[in-house]
Amino acid sequence: MIEQRIARLRAFLQEHDADGVIIVQPENLRYFSAFTGGEGALVIGLDQAVLWTDSRYTEQAANQSGTWYDIKNHHNALSSSIRSSLNDMEIGVAGYEENFLTHFMYENISDGALCGFLPCDLTSLRAVKEPYELKATRKASNIADRAFADLLPYIKPGVTE
């Protein structure tokens, strides 16, 4: 599952003339890595991938994402760690989540980075649902339907919520 997502992401990058991407948006972080920790960033190149997090989450990251990513502790220096990965991977053009990466973080990453930057929107890659996602959505919908059906007898005019 994650392997196919990373492959689709890399194909997306090549279509957009980029050879790497920085991912910090929690939804994309989870989608492309399975990492559910509270803090982290992905730097994905065409043949390497790093998940940066802090010491609170390194074990969790290794358990959830260690198969696909090199897990690293950023030691409270996330921006410089991301920049280091971009330079180490020799990325020429890095995509970044324009609507999520803060200007402050962008400035800190780009200062000293040896690559160019390209804003990109990765939501289209999450739009096509996989079979397990459809199954989970159906299950959630059924739970919501049952909860609403259980609530209906109590909803009457004049009844306080």
Question: Residue locations for each model-derived region?
Answer:
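Structural motif
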Residues: 24-26, 53-55, 76, 96-101
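Flexible, acidic/His-enriched mid-domain "rim/lid" segments that flank
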Residues: 77-161
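Short, surface-exposed linear patches
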Residues: 43-46, 64-66, 72-76, 115-119, ...
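Compact, glycine/acidic-enriched structural inserts
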Residues: 53-84
